[in-house]
Amino acid sequence: GNEIADSTVSLVKFIKPDPDAIFSSTCFGDTVSSDPAFSIPIKQESCKNTCSSALFKGSQSANPFPFMDGSYFAFMDDKDYYSLSGILGPPVSSFGDGFEGNGFSNQSLNVAIKQETEDSSFYPENNMPSSAIVGVNSCGQSFHYRIGAQGTISLSRPLNRDQSFQNLSSFPPMSSLVESWKTQSELAQNTLSSRRNDGFPVPGYIPENMSSTTLRSMSTGPSRPSKVCLVCGDEASGCHYGVVTCGSCKVFFKRAVEGKCSRQHSYLCAGRNDCIIDKIRRKNCPACRLQKCLQAGMNLGARKSKKLGKLKGVHEEHPQQPLQQTPTASPKEDTTLTSSSKEPSANSNSLVPLISAVSPAITLSAAVILENIEPEIVYAGYDNTQPDTAENLLSSLNQLAGKQMVQVVKWAKVIPGFRNLPLEDQITLIQYSWMCLSSFALSWRSYKHASSQFLYFAPDLIFNEERMRQSAMYDLCQGMQQISLEFSRLQLTFEEYTLMKVLLLLSTVPKDGLKCQAAFEEMRVNYIKELRKVLLKSPHNSGQSWQRYFQLTKLLDSMQDLVGDLLEFCFYTFRESQALKVEFPAMLVEIISDQLPKVESGIAKPLYFHRK
């Protein structure tokens, strides 16, 4: 009735009820219980049945990865900026009749995979083929950590817990928590009061038994934030030299680079080349300001690029190169069909003409596609003039997470096979995995750009030891850093990282199953096989691919434990956001409002590769 429609209005707006075509009956009949949040019947589109019987009769589409269709990459729309279903949109029509689950080549996986005994905490194996890889019984070193609020972590060095938060497993009362955060209270209060004009709501106190509909209704729909300069954080005037910047940084970069070419300027930093560059202090150190311009991607050759919407950031895989150096091609760039030193990403339209120029006879592998759709790094726009108090740091992290979630949804919708799932299943998987994806990407950035010594949330928001303690989540920060250190120890490759991230997207499901559980299981097994195939082809493994697979899947299981503690802390600050003065953007309000009651009621079920 009206109550169900109100509770799902922002997530399933594109779903049309049809009493004659109930979608859930096309999967396993009535054996799979539907999620109460999506209990309305789903209209089944003709020629778009992602769970048709053809999947189980062995028929496959001629081209399981239809990347020649331009609509497949048409994900740069801004419709409903803060809604998951608005970004995901209705199912695309370019996927054809069949599900692309069998599109992964498994020629090198003819040997049967040994499975672990069935257990309630493992990946469901009912009605699965014998080739389904759901875990391994293997010897070797275990990298399974119990991290964060509800346990301890084994680190190479002892942990010095923050004295104000020695036991996060039993959160302190609200009054004592507020008192411990009120260092420099007057300055922090003035800063926060001025920052509430940025369009992001501050939810009030939320009781334990409040429904997701009421949770979501407490937030107001904010206007989309304006563009900010990626160098100093001031209001941007346009896209200058390929990067969204203000007029001051535009003029500075032009004069600095042209003067450097003519040897009129030779900037030197009086400190350690790590000066803070913001709106107030941008003129203090020209050397660090120029360095930040180059790191943001400014280039004199891009002066003709005037479109404001094309924001250029720092890419995950390639470190920043000085402007005067000539980029050299690497083997990875040759195999990913790119023509420049920078890989295309989910925020770039450059991939569309590249894919269109490829001969239709060429079928790209899933691993290559994942490398090309990987999102770029998002800037936090952190105000370095404000004090590093817990409320300021956590509010900035929440706003950054809201921006990253928009990228995560756009990334998910172009993952091969994901759009073949019902819209409700897509939304459910994103809601259950958003924290896992964010922390996993954070560990990768910290590994690539900070040598795992700091937490690289954004180029303008990096957590050192002091900021970790100030954030009131020191133990959790240490846990995320430990994952990054494992990346460094294992020398994780970008190809492995992208495949593991997809598996994390597919690693938490409702206990009663998804709307189309069979399609989900087929997709997950295919990506596990793809990871195995990548490990077999890697020359660095030299016959030790199973040991490598064991280590990587152990690391994925460790992420589940870490994320459980991160969610507990996130839900706590969400409920106490008004008292703690922690801001949440509307995107996170929507996701957490729907996720919180499901997780706390035990509906969510993590899928592990190994016995706990």
UniProtKB/Swiss-Prot annotation:
Keyword Nuclease in record: no
Single Gene Ontology MF annotation: estrogen response element binding
Binding site for 21-hydroxyprogesterone: N398, Q404, R445, T573
UniProt region (Hinge), positions on chain: 299-349
Binding-site list for aldosterone: N398, Q404, R445, T573
Zinc finger NR C4-type: from-to: 229-249, 269-293
Cell compartment(s), UniProt: Cytoplasm; Nucleus
UniProt feature coiled coil, ranges: none
SUPFAM superfamilies: Glucocorticoid receptor-like (DNA-binding domain), Nuclear receptor ligand-binding domain
InterPro entries with a match to the protein in the record: NHR-like_dom_sf, Nucl_hrmn_rcpt_lig-bd, Nuclear_hormone_rcpt_NR3, Nuclear_hrmn_rcpt, Znf_hrmn_rcpt, Znf_NHR/GATA
Domain NR LBD: 350-592
UniProt region (Modulating), positions on chain: 1-228
Region (Disordered): 310-348
GO cellular component: chromatin; cytoplasm; nucleus
Binding sites annotated in the UniProt record for Zn(2+) 1: C229, C232, C246, C249
Pfam families: Hormone_recep, zf-C4
Highest taxon of source: Eukaryota
Region (Important for coactivator binding) residue spans: 410-413
A biological-process GO annotation: regulation of transcription by RNA polymerase II
Domain remark text: Composed of three domains: a modulating N-terminal domain, a DNA-binding domain and a C-terminal ligand-binding domain.
Similarity field: Belongs to the nuclear hormone receptor family. NR3 subfamily.
Task of the protein: Receptor for both mineralocorticoids (MC) such as aldosterone and glucocorticoids (GC) such as corticosterone or cortisol. Binds to mineralocorticoid response elements (MRE) and transactivates target genes. The effect of MC is to increase ion and water transport and thus raise extracellular fluid volume and blood pressure and lower potassium levels.
Protein name as catalogued: Mineralocorticoid receptor
Organism: Xenopus laevis
